Amino acid sequence: MSDWDKTMDLLFGFVTGHIHSRMFETILKFSICDLLEDGPKHYSEISKIIGFKNESYCYRLMRYFVPYKLFNESVVQVGLFSKTPSSTQFSKNGTLKNLGRFHCQDHHYRIFESLPKTLEMGKNQGPSSIGLSSFWEHFETDESYKQLFHNAMKDYTSLIIDRLISKISLSPNFKTVVDIGGSHGFLIGKLLESNPNIHGINFDLENIINSSTSKNENFQHPRLKHVSGDFFNSVPEADCYILKYILHDWSDEKCITILNNIHKSLKPNGKLFINDLVLDPSNYTKEAVFKDILMMQYFDAKERSINEWHQLFEKCGFKIDSVDTSISPQLMIVSKINSSNINLNDCTNFNSEIVEEKLKNSLPQFVNC
């Protein structure tokens, strides 16, 4: 690679992301990946199927993605495209199409117009870019967006569910497990299939559990109940709680409220299984730091390091027993601290310096298997 090519790669790597994703959104919008699933096609045929007025534009768009391994173009017959493992992932046969469409939504671009203002003011300004005071309002005002979000999260869960369930070891003494913010109950339903003596509760908001659309999509299992409520007020009593990608959506203050409510309802010797990213300062992944900025700009929330998780849990009377780093997001197993000197109603007295000192002497067991 010449010096010029290296320079251009450096430049394009930093400045073309928004254009690149807009081109990719066009690929998804017209389901071009789907059209290649049954065999190679010439761009002229693809243009005709979709109804493009200028077939050369279709060719140029598809050609753009050849270096990114989204499509293959024949060297024998120029313009003949075939699928790749990547294009299949973004087709109806894959698991990334809904996730791709979700992240390419227009307002996701607009939200980041106010990133400089977020930094200047010290509070996220993302929702104001689309005329909202909170990003969660978007789920109340746009039914199609809410449905796309739930489809995307279901696909995301399908990517990790088998691995995650294999890591969740439930005590034979557990009778009830609650999935907090479990959407349509896909995860807890699958967990019940491999744990025949457990009863499950899928706990989420009223408009998610009981809407006409949701009732058709809710996972059905004889030992599973779908219960609506607000985890900022209370949660159902249980021996075990699962929180998959929930706490990273909220500030420390909001997380404290959620965890305190769980602490009140967790039965003796109970456990929490927290599936969330754990930032590693010695090895930041692109996924982790990207999602951290998303959480900041969308929700005034964040991804957390192991020290930050420790501090958060200890504020609410919990401790980390182990962290499984063999899956991502990581799986933390959390239990109550057996101590009488923790005042759950006065988290403002928490002293981070004391916790930092404790961390030096009592880090959790890290499991990598």
Swiss-Prot record:
GO BP: biosynthetic process; methylation
Annotated Pfam families: Methyltransf_2
EC number(s) recorded for this UniProt protein: 2.1.1.-
InterPro entries, alphabetized: COMT-like, O_MeTrfase_dom, SAM-dependent_MTases_sf, WH-like_DNA-bd_sf, WH_DNA-bd_sf
Reaction(s) catalysed by this chain's protein: resorcinol + S-adenosyl-L-methionine = 3-methoxyphenol + S-adenosyl-L-homocysteine + H(+)
Binding site for S-adenosyl-L-methionine: G181, D204, G229, D230, F231, K244
Keyword Methyltransferase found: yes
Active site per database record: H248 (proton acceptor)
Any GO MF annotation of the entry: methyltransferase activity
Keywords noted in UniProt: Methyltransferase, S-adenosyl-L-methionine, Transferase
Entry-linked PANTHER family: O-METHYLTRANSFERASE (PTHR11746)
Role according to the record: S-adenosyl-L-methionine dependent O-methyltransferase that may be involved in modifying resorcinol ring to synthesize a variant of 4-methyl-5-pentylbenzene-1,3-diol.
Family label: Belongs to the class I-like SAM-binding methyltransferase superfamily. Cation-independent O-methyltransferase family. COMT subfamily.
Protein's name according to its UniProt entry: O-methyltransferase 12
Annotated gene: omt12
